[in-house]
């Protein structure tokens, strides 16, 4: 199915601002400036493995300078899994994307989700960012990866390609920039075709690879 967001702002206090479900593929076109912010335990753009088996493609094919700011609630990914859910089969082919995972609600800052990928205790797998993506930014809340796994889980099969692709990935406390959250591994991560990637891990987390306690 095809869905277009055009200058949309959705903020939910209790649920996901946008949720992808079912076995089919979903193509999300970005036109103009769009903002999605979800409630606690939910992802900004929620795509749980348990609910969605197809591929979510986020794109900007119309050339209208589409952008998306997706912010997860506490323990939810910016784009991907809710709390205790994995996020996979996510493809970004265009648009300016800022995805921020949610942190825990306690002062210790434990737990946390990936910017793009898994929620708290959820992995991030089969994530592809290809040419034409202007600037996907993934920033974790607390101990998840910028792109990859949430706290306690890994990030696998992550590919970034294309000379026009610019990616900034910032892991949270103990998470990798790209790969695993705290205590999670990062495996099969590929950067190719001149993609411009900046990946910053948190304390003891790799820029690209595993989170704290795992290594690169």
Identify the role of each PLM range.
Residues 1-216:
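A composition-driven surface/loop motif
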């Amino acid at each position: 199915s095809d869905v277009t967001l055009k200058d949309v702002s959705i903020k939910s206090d209790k649920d996901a601002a946008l949720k992808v479900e079912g076995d089919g593929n979903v193509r999300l076109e970005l036109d103009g400036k769009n903002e999605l912010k979800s409630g606690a335990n939910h992802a900004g753009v929620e795509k749980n493995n348990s609910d969605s088996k197809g591929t979510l493609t986020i794109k900007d094919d119309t050339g209208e300078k589409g952008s998306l700011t997706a912010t997860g609630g506490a323990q939810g990914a910016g784009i991907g899994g809710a709390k205790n859910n994995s996020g996979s089969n996510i493809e970004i082919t265009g648009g300016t994307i800022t995805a921020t995972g949610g942190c825990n609600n306690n002062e210790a800052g434990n737990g946390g989700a990936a910017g793009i990928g898994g929620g708290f205790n959820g992995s991030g797998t089969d994530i592809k960012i290809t040419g034409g993506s202007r600037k996907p930014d993934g920033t974790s809340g607390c101990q998840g990866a910028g792109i990859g796994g949430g706290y306690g889980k890994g990030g696998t099969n992550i590919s970034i390609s294309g000379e026009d692709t610019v990616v900034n990935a910032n892991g949270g406390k103990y998470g990798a920039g790209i790969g695993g959250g705290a205590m999670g591994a990062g495996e099969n991560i590929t950067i190719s075709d001149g993609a411009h990637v900046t990946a910053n891990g948190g304390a003891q987390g790799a820029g690209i690879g595993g989170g704290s306690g795992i290594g690169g």
